[in-house]
């Protein structure tokens, strides 16, 4: 007799963005004459640059000839792309072996699957946090039961205005998820701040899973774009990154994960974790699609970087427009300078979902309730800078004119 995985019963009844979609559909059905302006999910909106389109076409064309056709590629990724990714770190004075780079179909699956190569242990996540980290921990059986929305075995690293959205060290944690620039708060971390977690992880033989998916949005040259800019991080950290937001590949699907050969965990010699991840990938993953990998190669060229930077600048200008609009209304907000997200306080301490409904009903703008990212997100709200400029401007204008404060 077989049953279900009981850990799934501890998941929230609905995924955050599914609930947003449900409420938005209900509003649209009740008011079909109104246009809803979406500043919610962080999905890219602008067309891919010409050089990238040409590269993707090239990838398709290669499949049209017997001489250039390719079937399955290496599970770890195209060797040229792995080298190009490793070389891209040199600008930050980081030397990677291409064999430490594993090409993926985007960051999300690796962020969840990485924990499968580690034994039981305590997981720590920032609070508020990207929901996938928490749901992954629940499914793996490491989170324990939920009591009033708090998971008994999960360590919550509180990030708020008081601590500058950078958490204090936990008493104990075996696997630590960190994300900078941060989703949802838009906060960044300094090298000195990250060093405290690297030192903690080395002392305790813990592993940091560092989500760097928004690193391309960092404009401040003093801020680190990679955890490996921190001395010792190669001994304790795995970095996950993606072409989704930096190159507009949300629908194309391509990313990478760095697993250093020098990474050390309890009862495992250097190289073991890299070997285990390689074994895991060759068992469960047939490799990223050949076509996106052709695009990824061009993203990392000088021309590709210039074209992608222009789109990043476009989204950051959207963020500036949103921040300015909130400031004009006297609403406190954070982020949006080195990240595409703006994290705002709800007026008068209003509950996040109550503000979602108020914003939708009064201004026809959709955002993301902060509490959906964790208990410490209550009383906050995330707005996304991913959108067409005309929609961003219309949304900010509607908030200015119609939000009753």
Where are these regions (language model features)?
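N-terminal small-domain helix-loop-helix segment of the aminotransferase-like
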Residues: 2-105, 299-302, 405
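Helix C-cap/helix->beta junction micro-motif
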Residues: 31, 140, 203-204, 329, ...
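Conserved core of the PLP fold type I
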Residues: 66-203, 215-231, 398
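PLP-dependent enzyme catalytic core of the Aspartate aminotransferase-like
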Residues: 87, 91, 95, 349, ...
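Hydrophobic residues in well-ordered beta-strands that form the structural core
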Residues: 125, 210, 367-369
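Conserved core segment of the aminotransferase class I/II
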Residues: 147, 229-313, 320, 324, ...
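Conserved glycine-rich beta-strand-loop-beta hairpin in the small C-terminal domain of fold type I
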Residues: 293, 297, 312-323, 333-346, ...
């Amino acid at each position: 007799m077989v049953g279900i995985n009981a850990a799934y019963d501890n998941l929230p009844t609905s995924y955050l963005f599914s609930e947003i979609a449900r409420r938005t559909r209900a509003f649209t059905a009740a008011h079909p004459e109104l246009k809803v302006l979406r500043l919610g999910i962080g999905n890219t909106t602008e067309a891919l640059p010409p050089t990238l389109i040409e590269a993707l076409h090239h990838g398709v064309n290669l499949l049209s000839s017997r001489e250039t056709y390719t079937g399955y590629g290496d599970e770890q990724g195209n060797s040229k792309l792995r080298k190009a990714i490793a070389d891209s770190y040199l600008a930050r004075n980081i030397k990677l072996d291409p064999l430490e780079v594993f090409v993926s179909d985007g960051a999300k699956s690796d962020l969840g699957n990485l924990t499968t190569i580690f034994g039981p242990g305590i997981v720590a996540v920032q609070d508020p946090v990207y929901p996938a980290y928490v749901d992954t921990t629940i499914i793996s059986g490491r989170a324990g039961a939920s009591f009033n929305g708090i998971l008994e075995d999960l360590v919550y690293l509180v990030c708020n205005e008081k601590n500058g959205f950078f958490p204090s060290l936990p008493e104990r944690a075996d696997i630590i998820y960190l994300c900078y620039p941060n989703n949802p708060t838009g906060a960044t971390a300094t090298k000195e701040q990250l060093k405290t977690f690297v030192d903690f992880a080395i002392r305790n033989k813990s592993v940091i899973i560092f989500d760097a998916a928004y690193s391309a949005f960092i404009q401040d040259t003093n801020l680190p774009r990679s955890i490996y800019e921190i001395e010792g991080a190669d001994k304790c950290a795995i970095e996950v990154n993606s072409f989704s937001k930096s190159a507009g590949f949300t629908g194309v699907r391509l990313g990478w994960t760095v697993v250093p050969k020098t990474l050390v965990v309890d009862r495992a010699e250097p190289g073991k974790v890299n070997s285990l991840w390689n074994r895991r990938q060759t068992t469960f993953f047939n490799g990223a699609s050949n076509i996106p990998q052709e695009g990824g190669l061009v993203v990392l060229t000088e021309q590709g970087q210039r074209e992608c930077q222009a789109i990043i600048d476009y989204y950051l200008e959207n963020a500036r427009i949103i921040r300015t609009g909130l400031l004009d209304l006297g609403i406190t907000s954070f982020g949006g300078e080195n990240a595409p997200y703006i994290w705002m306080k709800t007026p008068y301490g209003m509950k996040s979902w109550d503000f979602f409904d108020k914003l939708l009903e009064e201004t026809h703008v959709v955002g993301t309730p902060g509490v959906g990212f964790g208990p410490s997100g209550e009383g906050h709200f995330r707005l996304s800078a991913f959108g067409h400029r005309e929609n961003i401007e219309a949304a900010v204008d509607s908030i200015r004119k119609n939000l009753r404060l």
